[in-house]
Amino acid sequence: MSAATDQILEQLKSLTLLEASELVKQIEEAFGVSAAAPVGGGMMMMAPGGAAPAAAEPEEEKTEFDVVLEDVPADKKIAILKVVRAITGLGLKEAKDLVESAPKPIKEATNKDDAESIKKQLEEAGAKASVK
C-alpha cells in the first residue's frame, strides 16, 4: 500500500465506535451510498467461508476482547448510564443512545483484565454484560 493509504488505515484503527459511526454517515452522504448489509444470498455465501479459518486455528489464544452490553433493566438505567459514561468517556446523549440500543459493544479490542473489570462494573450497576 502507499503511504497515504497506510496513514488512513492507522487513523481508522484509532477511531472510537461513535467516531466510526459518524464517519460512515458522512461517507454515505458524501458519496450517495449505503453501508447497509445486503439482504438475501450475499450473506449466505459469506458464512461458510468465514467459519473455516476459525476452525483451522483453535489453539491461538485470544488477546483482544470486546465487552458487550447485553441487557439494561429499566430500573437500573441511570446507574448503568453513569458507568458507561465513566468507561467510554462519552457525553450524556451518546452514552444514553448506547445504553438504550443494547446489545451494543461498550469497549472493543481491550485486554482480558480490562474487559473483565468493565464487565464487573456493568454487572454491579445491574446490567447484563458479556466478554467476547
UniProtKB/Swiss-Prot annotation:
UniProt xrefs under Pfam families: Ribosomal_L12, Ribosomal_L12_N
CDD domains named in the record: Ribosomal_L7_L12
UniProt GO cellular component terms: cytosolic large ribosomal subunit
Gene3D superfamilies, alphabetized: 3.30.1390.10, Single helix bin
Residue stretches of biased makeup (Basic and acidic residues): 102-126
Region entry Disordered, spans: 102-132
Keywords for this protein: Ribonucleoprotein, Ribosomal protein
Entry GO MF terms: mRNA binding; structural constituent of ribosome
InterPro entries: Ribosomal_bL12 (IPR000206), Ribosomal_bL12_C (IPR013823), Ribosomal_bL12_C/ClpS-like (IPR014719), Ribosomal_bL12_oligo (IPR008932), Ribosomal_bL12_oligo_N_sf (IPR036235)
Any GO BP: translation
Similarity comment: Belongs to the bacterial ribosomal protein bL12 family.
Oligomer status and interactors: Homodimer. Part of the ribosomal stalk of the 50S ribosomal subunit. Forms a multimeric L10(L12)X complex, where L10 forms an elongated spine to which 2 to 4 L12 dimers bind in a sequential fashion. Binds GTP-bound translation factors.
HAMAP family found in the cross-reference section: Ribosomal_bL12
Function: Forms part of the ribosomal stalk which helps the ribosome interact with GTP-bound translation factors. Is thus essential for accurate translation.
Database matches in NCBIfam families: L12
Name of the protein this chain belongs to: Large ribosomal subunit protein bL12
Organism: Rippkaea orientalis (strain PCC 8801 / RF-1) (Cyanothece sp. (strain PCC 8801))
Gene name tied to this protein: rplL
